[in-house]
Each structure stands twice: as structure tokens, then as C-alpha cells.
């Protein structure tokens, strides 16, 4: 147990930088990004066509920051932005929004040069030093709780596959599904299948062997050991079968409301009742809605 470290990708990067003696620029957090973007927006205000009037609105800088962060995560640079502008066409409002984002992106990157590094760029810096790490050469890396990986994370995984003794990735999957066949993003367990097929492709490109999967499909699941109705629902929801649960149960209730307000009041009343009379805590309860704007 003493040899186990629980780390995020960012903390792993810092650990390896310390080992290999890699000096790197200070890592910029979200608040720092917001402050710098506010300055960039002021410096380039005259070049902004669509976003100029919005940059001073409450929370707008944070939204732009999130967009620029996703650009880094998904390998969208200046050239990709230009291609997106061409695809949008000069007659569309999207064209000028992308043009403003391009101005802010270039200004942001220019300001960071030789000063700071973002969390998104940290993993690219880690990719360049992975092969020099003795810690990683003797390590087993276990990735748990991920629904998928960004392109920069996939590049890092490719490096880790070549260097580490073993890389283990956990994926949520039903025993009736083929994890190696990804067809479209709307199929059941699409995120897990996309993760598996992407990792298989990365391993093939790096000429790394892939072991047979270890499938933990024991039934009944521990969380349903005293609730067969919920286990039946878990196995059959979104599957168009003719199976019916015929035993008496009280785990699933259906309430028909006349309008969204009545529906919300019923849910809130049920939550309050569970907390006051059944010993529940609010953190034990989840409310899932299809549309928060209704």
C-alpha cells in the first residue's frame, strides 16, 4: 500500500517533472486565465466584431476561457480555427464569432509565451519527458473513473504504454455488449466502447500488446443484492425486450403530473419526506431531469 499513489494527470506531471529535473513555467489556474483574458479583451477590443459588447458582461470571460481551454484539449489551433471559419462562410454570424475567438486565442497564447503554462499544455510537456522517468519504467498505471480521454490525454497514454510496466484502464460495460465495436455515439455504452477502440488503436500504433480483458460481471450486483426490481430495471432499461417484472415491488413508483410545476412539487415533497422521516441526507438523493429550463 505504501507504494500506491493516487494522482490526477496534473499531479503526475509535477511528480515526473521533479524526478527528471524538468523546469517548467508556472501553471496558470482558471482565475489567472480569466484575468489575462480580461486584459487581452481590452487590448484587442478594436479588433473584436461580435464579442466586443459581451466581454464585460458578468460571467462571459469565464465562458470564453472554457472555450479556449477546450481548444487546447481537443487540438484546435489557429489553422483549425481558420478551417472552421471557411466552413461557416463569411455571411454567417458564426464566422465572426470564430474570428473574434481566433483574435483572443492568438493574443492569449502570445501573452503566455515564456511566462505561464496552462493545465491543458501541461500534459504535452509531460509527454516530452516520460521516456526519461525511472519511476514510470517500473510502474503499473491504473486509470479508473474516466468516461473517455481527450486527444492530449491519448497522446500521453501512448507514451505511457511504451514506458510503463503495465497500464490498466477500467471501463463501464454490460456483459451483453461487445466492447470492441463502436458504431455511433447514441448506442448503449458508447463512451466505454469509444474508449476501448481508441486505446486499441493507440496500442497498435505503438506496437504494444493488449491482454485479454478482465470482466467483472458477477450477478447480482452488490448494490442490488436486496433489490431485485432495481436490478431488473438496470438490466433492461433502454433495451426493447418483452421481459416484464412480475413480482410485487415498491422500489419503482410512477407519478403522473398535470404540469412541470406539480411534478417538481411532488419530487421536492418526496425528498423532504425522506430526509425528515427516513433518516436520509440530501447528499444521498439524486434528482434527474430531462430539461432544467422547463
Feature annotation, model-predicted:
Residues 1-83, 89-92:
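Conserved P-loop NTPase-based nucleic-acid remodeling module centered on helicase motor cores
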Residues 6, 50, 142, 168-171, ...:
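A structural signal for short, well-ordered beta-strand segments and their strand-loop junctions
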Residues 130-132, 204-294:
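Helicase P-loop NTPase motor core
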Residues 10, 172-181, 216-221:
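Short beta-alpha junction loops
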Residues 29-30, 79-199, 203, 211, ...:
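Conserved helicase NTPase motor core
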Amino acid at each position: 500500500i505504501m507504494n500506491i499513489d493516487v494522482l490526477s494527470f496534473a499531479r503526475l506531471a509535477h511528480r515526473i517533472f521533479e524526478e527528471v529535473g524538468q523546469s517548467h513555467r508556472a501553471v496558470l489556474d482558471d482565475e489567472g486565465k480569466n484575468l489575462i483574458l480580461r486584459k487581452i479583451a481590452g487590448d484587442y477590443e478594436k479588433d473584436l466584431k461580435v464579442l466586443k459588447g459581451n466581454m464585460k458582461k458578468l460571467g462571459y470571460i469565464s465562458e470564453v476561457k472554457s472555450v479556449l481551454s477546450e481548444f487546447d484539449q481537443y487540438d484546435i489551433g489557429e489553422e483549425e480555427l481558420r478551417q472552421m471559419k471557411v466552413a461557416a462562410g463569411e455571411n454567417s454570424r458564426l464566422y465572426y464569432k470564430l474570428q473574434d475567438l481566433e483574435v483572443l486565442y492568438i493574443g492569449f497564447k502570445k501573452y503566455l509565451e515564456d511566462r505561464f503554462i496552462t493545465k491543458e499544455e501541461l500534459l504535452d510537456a509531460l509527454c516530452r519527458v516520460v521516456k526519461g522517468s525511472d519511476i514510470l519504467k517500473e510502474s503499473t498505471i491504473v486509470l479508473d473513473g474516466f468516461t473517455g480521454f481527450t486527444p492530449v490525454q491519448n497522446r500521453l497514454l501512448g507514451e505511457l504504454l511504451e514506458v510503463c510496466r503495465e497500464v490498466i484502464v477500467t471501463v463501464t460495460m454490460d456483459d451483453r455488449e461487445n466492447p470492441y465495436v463502436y458504431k455511433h455515439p447514441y448506442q448503449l455504452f458508447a463512451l466505454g466502447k469509444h474508449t476501448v477502440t481508441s486505446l486499441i488503436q493507440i496500442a497498435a500504433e505503438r506496437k504494444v500488446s493488449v491482454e485479454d480483458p478482465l470482466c467483472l460481471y458477477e450477478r447480482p450486483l452488490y448494490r442490488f443484492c436486496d433489490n431485485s426490481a432495481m436490478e431488473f430495471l438496470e438490466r433492461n432499461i433502454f433495451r426493447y425486450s418483452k421481459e416484464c417484472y412480475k413480482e410485487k415491488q415498491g422500489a419503482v413508483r410512477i407519478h403522473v403530473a398535470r404540469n412541470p410545476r406539480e411534478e417538481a412539487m411532488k419530487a421536492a415533497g418526496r425528498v423532504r419526506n425522506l430526509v425528515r422521516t427516513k433518516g436520509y441526507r440530501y447528499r444521498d438523493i439524486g434528482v434527474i431531469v430531462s430539461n432544467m429550463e422547463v
